[in-house]
Amino acid sequence: MADSRSLLDTINSPRDLKKLSIRQLETLANECRHELINLISLNGGHFASSLGVTELSVALHHVYNTEKDRIVWDVGHQAYIHKMLTGRRERMNSNRKYGGISGFPKIHESPHDAFGTGHASTSISAAAGIASARDLKGGNEKVIAVIGDGSMTGGMAFEAMNHLGDLKNDVLVILNDNQMAISPSTGGLKTHMVNFTLNKTYNKARRLLWESMSMMNNDLAERAKTSLRRLEDGMKAALTPGAFFEALGLRYFGPIDGHNMGQLVRALREMQELPHPKLLHVITTKGKGFLPAEENQSDWHAHNGGFDTVTGITAKKEGPSATPKYQEVFGEALVEMALKDPAITAITAAMPTGTSLDLFQKAMPDRFYDVGIAEGHAVTFAAGQALEGLKPVCAIYSTFLQRALDQVIHDVALQNLPVVFAIDRAGLVGEDGPTHHGAFDLSYLHAVPGLTIMAPSDGQELRDMLHTALYHIDGPVAIRYPRGSTGGEEMRKNFTALEPGKGRMLKEGTGPVILTLGTMAATALEAGRLLENEGISVEIADMRFLKPLDTALIDRLSASATHIVTLEENSIIGGFGSAVADHLSEASKKTRLLRIGLPDAFVTHGSMTDLYRETGLDAPAVAEKIRLFYTGRES
């Protein structure tokens, strides 16, 4: 009886790919792509990037031994096929779910995940470090960095290549070019040059010629080597886009078709034979094999699932209409003000859609700047604009602003320049997990002199804070807000200026005081209702500002309260609670203090409900902590 299983069903580890023919590898790639489409349609996740590197993923595991050889996937959101082929296929349904596998490579999840990733442009640095350690220890494993999907716009990638060219370690950099950012030449000469540089005979002869001339220690040999090098470089510069990489010290190969399995396998086998740093330029199509994703790559970069696997049409979800997202409120408010104020500019680091700055881009493209994956440059670019009298608003995810802390301090705050930082995805972000949670911004910004730090509790406050930052504060301002929906409150058409450093009362009470910052106000109110049911009357204040802190309000409340609780969606170390503790200590207050926030740990991935429950930031857990604290029974 014929085996009815698919070829993918026979793959239990990468070792099973070694015996497959090119045609079988092509079949396997198609099966992987089909399974990925079905998987994302059910569960959601990063999508188009993995579709684009399906053939490359299969070819890499066919040629290399990833139990020994090291593949570092830049960013990591394109590694779903890699995970399927490395013993995790049966767990892919748990991808990005609480208790399931991560959506990114993790060294503790599989020996095939050589380096943990999640942020862009890190792969070449990691690969260079791994290779240098290998050489010091006398190893012979191969090291590969797969980078692309925008990551080549990050300066760290070029810093790493510059160093790698100097180190001369055996590292293969694979440039996954799915945006045609490095325009490939076309025509017969280009095809001939690609075949020529990948030819084994050519590369062997090239090595022998260079070695022979190296033994001829005379001026004639040096002149001959220089002439040959110039001839080869000139040919490559004329026929391929690789001259830049050659100048950094990496031998350039390609571009080749990233969906042609035969070309990929041949090229990778040739790369194995070259003992120096090299770059293989692979042209792919983001979203390959799923027409809706090919035609609209940005929208299909990631998806929440629930779409038809042929048409891509997403099923409409029943229930009430969604409330506005904080990102939408921010984007619309900024456009509203910028239409009346030509000094306002908008800056993003490759996240126009995620931050809703695409609204600004459409309305005022001449004042919109997408600097690429270059957060440090974005901040200093904003500083330059502010110095010249503009009002730059720099929208960056909290987790990515970490990469630009030096620029925030040195280029903005030190000069007291009026840059507004719209810190998106502050707090927990859900399924993307620890590489993307915005858990530290209050902690790392709190110490910066002269920086005003605000956090809205709802959409209207976000509008008012943005207006206040642009028109009523002289100096740099940071506004942090979470991913997801606002509370659905009705928002005014006008803007109201907030008094810097002043909070507001949300609820009067006679028992413990809860001081909240940002969207934890809703949790505080719900916890307060639970405590009221137990006979504990709580007082709740929305502090609005971490810096300057409303010390007058704290002093007034602590004058009569015996117990104060701080509540924040930030690390418990160095954030809002720490600021309140510092003030109470300096003021010699006898009031007892309980700080509630994210633990001193990296929080896993999962739904927001699961993560709030795990971290003790859901209303029942907050109420229980306050009850035990107030009644004197906390551990």
Curated annotation (Swiss-Prot):
A Gene Ontology BP annotation from the UniProt entry: isopentenyl diphosphate biosynthetic process, methylerythritol 4-phosphate pathway
Check the record and name the CDD domains matching this protein. Answer: TPP_DXS, TPP_PYR_DXS_TK_like
Which residues does Mg(2+) bind? 149, 178
Q: For this protein, what reaction is catalysed? A: D-glyceraldehyde 3-phosphate + pyruvate + H(+) = 1-deoxy-D-xylulose 5-phosphate + CO2
A single GO CC term for this protein reads:
cytosol
Spell out the Gene3D superfamilies in the cross-references. Answer: 3.40.50.920, 3.40.50.970
Residues binding thiamine diphosphate: 77, 118-120, 150-151, 178, 290, 375
What SMART domains has UniProt attached to this entry? Transket_pyr
Which InterPro entries does the UniProt entry name for this protein?
Answer: Dxylulose-5-P_synthase, THDP-binding, Transketo_C/PFOR_II, Transketolase-like_Pyr-bd, Transketolase_C, Transketolase_CS
Entry's cofactor comment: Binds 1 Mg(2+) ion per subunit. Binds 1 thiamine pyrophosphate per subunit.
Molecular function terms from GO: 1-deoxy-D-xylulose-5-phosphate synthase activity; magnesium ion binding; thiamine pyrophosphate binding
Keywords, A to Z, come to: Isoprene biosynthesis, Magnesium, Metal-binding, Thiamine biosynthesis, Thiamine pyrophosphate, Transferase
Pathway terms, separated by semicolons:
Metabolic intermediate biosynthesis; 1-deoxy-D-xylulose 5-phosphate biosynthesis; 1-deoxy-D-xylulose 5-phosphate from D-glyceraldehyde 3-phosphate and pyruvate: step 1/1
Question: Which proteins does it associate with, and in what oligomeric form?
Answer: Homodimer.
Q: Which NCBIfam families match?
A: dxs, PRK05444.2-2
For this protein, the record's HAMAP family field holds: DXP_synth
What name goes with this protein?
Answer: 1-deoxy-D-xylulose-5-phosphate synthase
The organism of origin for this protein = Chlorobium phaeovibrioides (strain DSM 265 / 1930) (Prosthecochloris vibrioformis (strain DSM 265))
Specify the taxonomic lineage. Bacteria, Pseudomonadati, Chlorobiota, Chlorobiia, Chlorobiales
